[in-house]
Amino acid sequence: MTREHQGGTRGLAAARKGFWSGLRFTSLRLRLVLVFGLVALTAAVSASGIAYWLNREAVLTRTQDAVLRDFEQEMQNRAGALPEHPTQDEVQHTAGQMANSSQRFSVLLVAENADGTAVYGSSGGLGGVALSDVPESLRTAVNKEQKLTSANKHPYHLYWQRITDDGTPYLVAGTKVIGGGPTGYMLKSLEPEAKDLNSLAWSLGIATALALLGSALLAQALATTVLKPVHRLGVAARRLGEGKLDTRLRVSGTDELADLSRTFNSAAENLEKRVADMAGREQASRRFVADMSHELRTPLTALTAVTEVLEEELEYAGEGEGEGGSFDPMVEPAVRLVVSETRRLNDLVENLMEVTRFDAGTARLVLDDVDVADQITACIDARAWLDAVDLDAERGVHARLDPRRLDVILANLIGNALKHGGSPVRVSVARADHEIVIRVRDNGPGIPEDVLPHVFDRFYKASASRPRSEGSGLGLSIALENAHIHGGEITAENAPEGGAVFTLRLPQDPSPPADEDGGPDEETEDRGKDAKGQV
């Protein structure tokens, strides 16, 4: 199969798929077309049936009346002129004359000769009408003498019947000559009338099909007209769901669909105002946090310097114990508390400033070639976690990352595992599809299912009763933002055998391809260049 043929086949398949998807059985368009079609079909079939029946009766009645009238006249004029006891030749000759009338029917005459024997005369000779061709019920009715009354002046009457022989319709009639004489039977083919009626039926069928097709096209046009505003409303609703809050519908008319469009526009406008108000409040709160963080940083720097001096004094006092320490034993716990809380406050302010950088979009990567195993070891060693962490990482796994931000991610993940899951914490490193995969698994009970979706939310705590010393609720959020700025991701789940597992995925080289002018990406900086954007 050639490529052009394949493309044409795919295009045809797509067109068929689009057609059937547009006419799916649950669609309003198809239901409208079906309803219009059924109504049109019912009306057309009813009208065609009535028209066919009326025309059929009119055609058959007109032909039948003309034939019967002519036959009755021929019976009185020609058959009535026969002698009382005619011969075979006389009867045969009269039947032939009667058959040559304007209506051209076949005739059978039955008379009695002088010795009482029945004499038959057929217009077609031996191949003409036989008495056996006449239904017995008709012969009985013709030969039955009626009682004479004031309303019935003659003992015998004309009777007729429609029959079908070998698929051809016939009109059969019979009567006796008034005043006495032979009995006559007439056979008239109705095949020309049947052909005319068949042509009429075909014409009515074609008209019905055309009416059905026209109604389907009309229904399609009406459905398009009716559903076009609904389609526009659906498109606008999807755009609104995608966050395009300025989406509005053009309203025209005063019908129900126009009212629906006005309601949508009003709801969209109110939603846009609410979202803008919420965004303004969020922006104001972020500015407040950023301003407060910067305002707190200056006095906190001085306070941190003082606490470092106090901490050194505590160390000297401990070394000089027995020779007269400089701290009162009652004051020493308070000093240690001040030092600890000052450090915690300093960490909180630094975390808040980090968050404000992410929100403002000013965070930058300072990339360097990093041995991942060495980086993890350095992170664990700097925090004295070597005895509580099992590291499964071979050396030589290199990636181009920001060492400081990777250290922040690892410190938060491992520290969180030690704090809430307990030791030993297992850290493993693997490579998969140009990615570095770092898994941190603790030895605790795992994360509750209702908490899992919120572990990376800012300031989220699983319980409001948790002690405030357990953290600010920003660590995992900052770790996730640092992973995102690398183009990576962090996921949290519970291991089947117990314990929580945090999986960090980072690309080995997060730098996007250089632009055509060779300029570096604005979101990253090389270690060898100016690093003033480092946070």
UniProtKB/Swiss-Prot annotation:
SUPFAM superfamilies: ATPase domain of HSP90 chaperone/DNA topoisomerase II/histidine kinase, HAMP domain-like, Homodimeric domain of signal transducing histidine kinase. Keywords: ATP-binding, Cell membrane, Kinase, Membrane, Nucleotide-binding, Phosphoprotein, Transferase, Transmembrane, Transmembrane helix, Two-component regulatory system. Residues 514-525 have a biased composition (Acidic residues). The keyword Protein biosynthesis does not apply. It is a multi-pass membrane protein. InterPro entries: HAMP_dom, HATPase_C_sf, His_kinase_dom, HisK_dim/P_dom, HisK_dim/P_sf, Sig_transdc_His_kin-like_C. The modification Phosphohistidine is found at residue 294. Residues 526-535 have a biased composition (Basic and acidic residues). GO terms for molecular function: ATP binding; phosphorelay sensor kinase activity. It is found in: Cell membrane. Residues 224-276 form the HAMP domain. Residues 53-198 are extracellular. The chain crosses the membrane at residues 31-52, 199-219. Its EC number is 2.7.13.3. Residues 291-510 form the Histidine kinase domain. It holds the Pfam family HisKA. PANTHER family: HYBRID SIGNAL TRANSDUCTION HISTIDINE KINASE C, TWO-COMPONENT HISTIDINE KINASE. This is Signal transduction histidine-protein kinase AfsQ2. The lineage of its organism: Bacteria, Bacillati, Actinomycetota, Actinomycetes, Kitasatosporales.
